[in-house]
């Protein structure tokens, strides 16, 4: 009996080590492909039509697009409304869809809600594990926000998105 439990324990440890190796190995850059164009102000961005399983959670007023912040690294953006910009940054492990219920309660005729999805999550590019750092995420989000030519924003950050988002401003 104890021998069998020992084998089971050893097997679980080995599986855990294999899993840890698989999760932390380098990985490779995966760049998503969009289609079409989305006009934001006087700029044009690569459109990202939402798949049906995601589109059912938002209204047709939402704009879904990519901003390429470095070669091959794209940040997926969701945006809705017109008026004063509100920048909402989700944390781990979620995406811009986190804020959809909050957005439902906002006066979208007076606010423009901008919701990037962190690199590595959702529809944004996937990068090797070694590239996930506060400094890199700050830089990528800063580049995305700079493309939108925002003079000022109201900022909302949650979890990991708090430090990353505030660093991007």
Give each language-model segment a name.
Residues 6, 10-13, 89, 115, ...:
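Hydrophobic alpha-helical transmembrane segments of multipass integral membrane proteins
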Residues 101, 167-168:
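Active-site signature of alpha/beta-hydrolase-fold catalytic machinery across serine-
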Residues 57-58, 70-71, 115-157:
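Active-site loop/oxyanion-hole signature of alpha/beta-hydrolase fold enzymes
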Residues 106, 168-169:
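Aromatic pocket-lining residues of Rossmann-like dinucleotide-binding sites
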Residues 2-84, 108-111:
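Alpha/beta-hydrolase fold catalytic core
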Residues 73, 78-123:
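Conserved HGGG/HGGXW glycine-rich cap/lid loop of the alpha/beta-hydrolase fold
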Residues 157, 161, 165:
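Gly/Ala-rich beta-loop-alpha elbow adjacent to hydrolase catalytic centers
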